[in-house]
From Swiss-Prot:
It comes from Spirogyra maxima (Green alga). One of its GO terms (molecular function) is rRNA binding. Part of the 50S ribosomal subunit. This is Large ribosomal subunit protein uL23c. Pfam families: Ribosomal_L23 (PF00276). Coiled coil: none annotated. Its main location: plastid. One of its GO terms (biological process) is translation. Binds to 23S rRNA. Belongs to the universal ribosomal protein uL23 family. Keywords: Chloroplast, Plastid, Ribonucleoprotein, Ribosomal protein, RNA-binding, rRNA-binding. InterPro entries: Nucleotide-bd_a/b_plait_sf (IPR012677), Ribosomal_uL23-like (IPR013025), Ribosomal_uL23/eL15/eS24_sf (IPR012678). GO terms for cellular component: chloroplast; ribonucleoprotein complex; ribosome. It is found in: Plastid, Chloroplast.
Length: 88
């Protein structure tokens, strides 16, 4: 449960809600099986499909030092027809 960081709310995530697909940002070491078990247990829904990807790195500048923010993995979860996850 501590591996799921947050749910991004952007234009693509909102567009995916129409197709019963929910977006989660998770720890890089989290697997699809772990995330599926957690979502099915916590929200009492049935997951029928999962896709994952790692968004590209972006540079951050702090004064004269250039670095990269902490990496994460994005999971797109598809639910069974009739199931939904509350947005709040």
């Amino acid at each position: 449960m501590d591996k799921i960081k947050y749910r991004p709310i952007g234009m693509k995530a909102i567009r995916l809600l129409e197709r019963r697909q929910y977006t989660f940002d998770v720890d890089v070491k989290a697997t699809k099986t772990e995330v599926k078990r957690w979502i099915e247990g916590f929200f009492s829904v049935k997951v029928v499909g999962m896709n994952s990807h790692r968004p590209p790195k972006k540079k951050k500048r702090m004064g004269s030092v250039i670095g990269y923010p902490v990496r994460y993995k994005r999971m797109i979860v598809t639910l069974k027809v009739g199931d939904s996850i509350p947005l709040s």
